């Protein structure tokens, strides 16, 4: 199935895009009518035996899901099969959600409404239509859990299901990808795609052709993680900032030696700081040609690590290692690193042995990875707020699915204070007051440091709270399962993707009625996040499936989102006796600050996307070329044409019955090696360009246009250089000495490789200009 071309982001208003991002009532009504029509087939499905049910499913014609008359029968059969195999009978709203995913939408379905089952039904529909489905999760735990949970349903209707985690072997992966439905984390799917770019035999390929991606927690994967590069690295020696520079930067003064911007995204030396560094390094000129790409880069990297990256906010230190914290999930970002020496600089700052970065052999962003699929759909509890990005970058619509039972959660207005200190005092007092009643409380904080500070204050005030953050995320399922227990107070960092429902009365619901009488779970937010979605994810933990619940957020004018996006001089300052601001404008001001923050994030996404788009296009050309070399006689034919005398010499020297096959293998190895070598060198060149491209603005050049010009020119040379190098190797390689074979020492590949994710810095704000890629390979 061909894929609809995706256009570049426009400049239309947020409200306009968000409206476009939502599917129309007409579409929802059509799907609802099909759910209603399924009722006519329920008795018929219930009367079928298990084998008859499986056979009936196989007879359905779902090849054109948008115009199939068999959809109501499919819904009736899958509902019956689900109840028999899992004990779960899908509600109408779950069937509706599945249909909207089968229509290619991202659905918004509230926490606790059964997204996992709806996703399995949608996956079944695609698979029965002959499609291969990847259910993409945010971590390995959910991939395996959901595959094992939903597997009996899929198998009951004649489908095969598999799952992949980091521990899966190559054989496990090939078997799982061979199933009709495969559950895997976005990381593992991406790493398999990258690792396939090192194979030299087509039989060693693991990752299949991308067909359908059904994405759980779609906003987290498609928006929050969109620009995270997945990296395949090989062992090599790379320079990191010198220890003397890291130590020197640590001694600089914030008052005089360096400045940061208002939202702490950038830091730079002042003239005073530059002179101090130059003197300490022996009187050098940091901005001379000799040092601008070396010493100055080391200083800037060390400065970034020392000033902008804060322990227990951006990272934690555990088991003598630096672990990045995913800001949108509040968890350790597994396998994630900072690029270009920054990881080593942070490790040196913390007195930890620096780890190897290696040479980047291949890389792909999550956004480019997902855009490979012919069909993309998904589910999340907060899709509408991400509708703008889903529309712009993936051309996806959003379908809001009503809850099975109306939501009765009481969401109170924000309580706003002038200072963070006053806000924190009010939070502690509020939590102590609620705890006295026995009502369970879930507190959402914005980072690890804040969660631990609040936890300590609560303990001092006699409130027996538990804390869940990136430092103890291995225990999260147990903590969250008991967060609805009578008297429980749970302090947690961001709740996105926690994957465990909070049941009133605890995991066994023994105190359910008592907690219901108290008002259900009470959610407290310690401040607005940079996007409305994260606030809604936290609120959504209360009021599950019609349960009572409540939420309230505390904010202050000193909070990051407000301080960076509102003029403090124009904010109301009159307070009541408790220090709470008295003004009808507070909610509107907070909403405005959040919208500004969201707009900035969208700009960052769009601008970074414009750089990554070219790299993704170039990578696609490399992949096509590599696949041609792997699966055909292209390499042998090209080298025979380029070096006919050498080819004939080798053909005559080798046994006639094996000459062609032997030469095909040899030519393929040579061509693949030099193609891969050229691509790795090209990626290193692009990384170097990106480090200094912003300086082009000083010369009144467009950084983006310059990046495109340099990248396109270099890529055009890559093809010619790779083929020329392959020809030279073919003509000089030791092929005839001893047993016929290639001297592999001349084609040495990395002795070890590993995969990781890069927490990459956003690039400058530029306007996208038209670009074109030459047909660099024949």
From Swiss-Prot:
Similarity section: Belongs to the SecA family.
Record key words, sorted: ATP-binding, Cell membrane, Cytoplasm, Membrane, Nucleotide-binding, Protein transport, Translocase, Translocation, Transport
E.C. no: 7.4.2.8
Protein name (database record): Protein translocase subunit SecA 2
Record-linked InterPro entries: Helicase_ATP-bd, Helicase_C-like, P-loop_NTPase, SecA, SecA_Actinobact-type, SecA_CS, SecA_DEAD, SecA_motor_DEAD
Principal subcellular localisation of the protein: membrane
GO molecular function: ATP binding; protein-exporting ATPase activity
């Amino acid at each position: 199935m061909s894929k609809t071309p995706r256009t570049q982001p426009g400049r239309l208003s947020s409200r306009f895009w968000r409206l476009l991002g939502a599917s129309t009532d007409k579409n929802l009504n059509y799907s609802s009518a099909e759910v209603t029509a399924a009722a006519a087939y329920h008795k018929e499905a219930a009367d079928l035996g298990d084998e008859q049910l499986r056979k009936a499913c196989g007879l359905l014609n779902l090849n054109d899901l948008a115009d199939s008359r068999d959809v109501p029968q499919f819904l009736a059969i899958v509902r019956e099969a689900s109840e028999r195999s899992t004990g779960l009978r899908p509600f109408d709203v779950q069937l509706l959600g599945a249909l909207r995913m089968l229509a290619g939408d991202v659905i918004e379905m509230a926490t606790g409404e059964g997204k996992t089952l709806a996703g399995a039904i949608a996956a079944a529909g695609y698979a029965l239509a002959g499609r291969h489905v990847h259910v993409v999760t945010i971590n390995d735990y959910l991939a395996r859990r959901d595959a094992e949970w939903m597997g009996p349903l899929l198998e009951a209707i004649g489908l095969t299901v598999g799952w992949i985690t980091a521990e899966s072997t190559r054989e496990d992966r090939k078997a799982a990808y061979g199933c009709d439905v495969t559950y895997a984390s976005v990381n593992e799917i991406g790493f398999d795609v990258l690792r396939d770019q090192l194979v030299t035999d087509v039989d060693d390929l693991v990752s299949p052709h991308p067909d359908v991606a059904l994405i759980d927690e779609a906003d987290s994967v498609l928006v929050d993680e969109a620009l995270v590069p997945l990296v395949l690295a090989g062992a090599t020696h790379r320079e990191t900032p010198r220890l003397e520079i890291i130590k020197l930067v640590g001694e600089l003064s914030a008052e005089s030696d360096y400045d940061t911007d208002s939202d702490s995204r950038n830091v730079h030396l002042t003239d005073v700081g530059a002179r101090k560094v130059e003197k300490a390094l022996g009187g050098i000129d940091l901005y001379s040609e000799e040092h601008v790409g070396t010493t100055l880069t080391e200083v800037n990297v060390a400065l970034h690590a020392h000033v902008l990256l804060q322990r227990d906010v951006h990272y934690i230190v555990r088991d003598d290692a630096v672990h990045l914290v995913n800001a949108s999930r509040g968890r350790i970002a597994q396998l994630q690193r900072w690029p270009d020496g920054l990881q080593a600089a942070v490790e040196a700052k913390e007195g930890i042995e620096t780890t190897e970065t290696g040479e980047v052999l291949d890389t792909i962003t999550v956004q480019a990875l997902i855009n490979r699929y012919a069909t993309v759909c998904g589910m999340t509890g907060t899709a509408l707020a991400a509708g703008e990005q889903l529309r712009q970058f993936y051309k996806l619509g959003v379908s809001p699915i009503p809850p099975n039972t109306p939501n009765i959660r009481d969401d109170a207005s924000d309580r706003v204070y002038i200072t963070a200190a006053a806000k924190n005092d009010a939070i502690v007092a509020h939590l102590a007051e609620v705890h006295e009643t026995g009502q369970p409380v879930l507190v959402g904080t914005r980072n690890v440091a804040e969660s631990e500070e609040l936890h300590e204050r609560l303990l001092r005030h006699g409130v027996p709270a538990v804390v869940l953050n990136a430092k103890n995320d291995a225990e999260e399922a147990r903590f969250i399962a008991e967060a609805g227990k009578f008297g429980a107070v749970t302090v947690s960092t961001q709740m996105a993707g926690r994957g465990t429902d909070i049941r009133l009365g605890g995991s066994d619901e023994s105190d359910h009625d008592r907690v219901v009488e108290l008002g259900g779970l009470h959610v407290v937010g310690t401040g607005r996040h940079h996007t409305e979605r994260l606030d809604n994810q936290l609120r959504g933990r209360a009021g599950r499936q019609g349960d009572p619940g409540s939420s309230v957020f505390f904010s202050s004018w000193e909070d990051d989102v407000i301080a960076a996006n509102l003029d403090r001089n124009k904010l109301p300052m009159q307070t009541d006796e408790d220090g709470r601001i008295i003004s009808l404008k507070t909610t509107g001001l907070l909403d405005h600050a959040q919208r500004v923050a969201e707009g900035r994030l969208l700009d960052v996404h769009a601008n970074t996307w414009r750089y990554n788009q070219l790299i993704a296009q170039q990578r696609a050309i490399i992949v096509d070329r590599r696949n041609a070399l792997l699966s055909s006689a292209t390499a042998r034919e090209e080298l025979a044409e380029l070096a006919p005398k050498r080819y004939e010499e080798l053909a005559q020297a080798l046994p006639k019955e094996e000459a062609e096959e032997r030469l095909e293998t040899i030519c393929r190895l040579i061509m693949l090696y030099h193609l891969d070598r050229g691509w790795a060198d090209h990626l290193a060149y692009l990384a170097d360009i990106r480090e200094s491209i912003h300086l082009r603005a000083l010369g009144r050049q467009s950084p983006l246009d310059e990046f495109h010009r340099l990248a396109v020119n270099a890529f055009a040379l890559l093809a010619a250089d790779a083929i020329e190098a392959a020809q030279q190797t073919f003509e000089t390689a030791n092929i005839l000495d001893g047993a016929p074979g290639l001297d592999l020492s001349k084609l040495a590949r990395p002795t070890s490789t590993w995969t990781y994710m890069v927490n990459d810095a956003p690039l400058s704000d530029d306007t996208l200009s038209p670009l074109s890629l030459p047909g660099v390979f024949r």
